Amino acid sequence: MKKINSFGIEFENSSTTPFFQVGEKNRIRFGMDVFEGNTKTLKKIIDFLFVRNEEIESSFIIGDISNLNNKIRYNKIGLSKFLKINNWKETSVVNDDLECTIVFASVKNINKNDVFSYCKSIVLGRSQSYIMFYNDTFLLYVSSDVLDIISKEEDNIDTLKINYSDIYDKRYA
């Protein structure tokens, strides 16, 4: 999760999405509804973000450990339908507010077509997970409501804002 931290993001802070953890010049937001019936645009955006497959990593919540019984309860998120998950690294973070420990997994070498398939499934109404895809340049946060993109380089976000000026969410721009 070191790579996530290089974006200025605290992934473990599940109370605040990554979008609100960075300045407005380093982020762009799309409502997922703009991709309904328009997944070609979604594909173009993902192709722009992730040029080479070998650089893509993902981190997501896989479960939690209750402070009461100290047993892990896994989320049934079905990511294996979209992502090839061989080697993952687990990180546990105590969350005092929820009175449990959140268990995160990080996976390397994600295929960009799998990123697209997952995002497309969310557009089509599939249940979401708290998940991010990232490389050295971009971080993509996906939920049922929004597709948030973060970059360390303001020029990258400017390019996206110019290319998709008619569809990105300008409320927080």
Each predicted region: which residue ranges?
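Short linear interaction motifs
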Residues: 121-133
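Extended, low-hydrophobicity segments enriched in charged/polar residues
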Residues: 1-121
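Surface-exposed polar/charged interaction patches
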Residues: 48, 52, 125, 167-170
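Alpha-helical oligomerization segments
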Residues: 130-173
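Broad gene-expression machinery/nucleic-acid interaction feature
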Residues: 57, 69, 128, 144-146
